[in-house]
Amino acid sequence: MAGSRRRIRLALLFGGRSTEHAISCISASGVLRALDRDVYDVVPVGIDTHGRWVVLPDDPTALAVTGDRLPAVVAAHGESVVLAADPTTPGLLPCRPRGGLDSVRNTLGSSDALGSSDIPGDIDVVFPLLHGPFGEDGTVQGLLEMAGLPYVGSGVFASAAAMDKQHMKALLRAAGLPVGSYAVLRAGDTLTGADQERLGLPVFVKPARGGSSIGISRVEAWADLDTAIKAARASDPKVLVESAIVGREIECGVLGILDGPGAEASVPAEITVTSSAGFYDFEAKYMSDATHFDVPANLSHAVREEVRGAAIAAFEALDCAGLARVDMFVTADDHVIINEVNTMPGFTPTSMFPRMWEASGVTYPQLVDRLVRLALRDGAGLR
């Protein structure tokens, strides 16, 4: 229509090579439903577990959980593409099965078809809805900066620092923020007797660069430590052993302010786990009803504001951008201890980040739109 505004072409990246592949797909299903097609020309780009990029149909139902089946990106269901790291060329290029590049068209076709002649090359903004290594850890963020594409979320440094729990905790502690006691085990390392005495029991053993509680074990006896370390190393050769903190599990969302600098915090939420695992593991998060959520959390005004302030302080200490979810503990004497910072929190229907913002007056579609607008405002280049 003459005079109509061109839609914003948004590439939604999901899937990926990490163990959180399925969670990313479920998150993408929710975001696809939330995006206004009158505003956005959406290009769903799935990354399979081998790292192949494919343009897929714009179908949220294909990425939803069906019974006990988790979704996955299947390369055969779409058209293979690569992202050009040269900012002078279109963002997405058709790719032959053996890796050769087709010629790039001068005139781009519709994104509704999946033929190689219709792959939309030019991209205005990217939403890298990827969780875990090879997606949330600064790798894809660096690629997007090389390609000259604006993208949702934190930059290379913040993404990498938040993904690696060792460095995240070190940076938070250096900023004067409270974190729990921990030890780092690299390949071949074992926990020393001095560390055992310092940490005490129980402890949590987890991959240093994992998420969605995959590979995490609660250890009640030192005799079980080696088994837990082996389980964590299935995801990451570097492992963290953390002192268990007795307290309420509290989460708080942080979101960039669109019409000015800085960020704001959502109302906090509380997680109570009733499963036999006794902690917020993968099954409790995504596959069962063994978790109770209070949104907002029942906290005193003073503690609530301390939690919100700590969330923003952690966000700023890591130099985050766009969004983050900060996980904390509140002890019986109302001390706030920061556990983790997630720079690309889940967007599944049960995820806490959108639920906390919904309780704060920001609807799911408004949340997604604001994140994209923040990315467009900040533009391409270094964060």
From Swiss-Prot:
EC nos: 6.3.2.4
Residue ranges of every copy of the ATP-grasp domain listed in the record: 169-373
GO CC terms: cytosol
Family matches, as Gene3D superfamilies: 3.40.50.20, ATP-grasp fold, A domain (3.30.1490.20), ATP-grasp fold, B domain (3.30.470.20)
PROSITE patterns (alphabetical): ATP_GRASP, DALA_DALA_LIGASE_1, DALA_DALA_LIGASE_2
Molecular functions (GO terms): ATP binding; D-alanine-D-alanine ligase activity; metal ion binding
Residue positions binding Mg(2+) 1: D327, E340
Subcellular location: Cytoplasm
Family membership noted in the UniProt record: Belongs to the D-alanine--D-alanine ligase family.
Protein name: D-alanine--D-alanine ligase
Organism annotation: Frankia casuarinae (strain DSM 45818 / CECT 9043 / HFP020203 / CcI3)
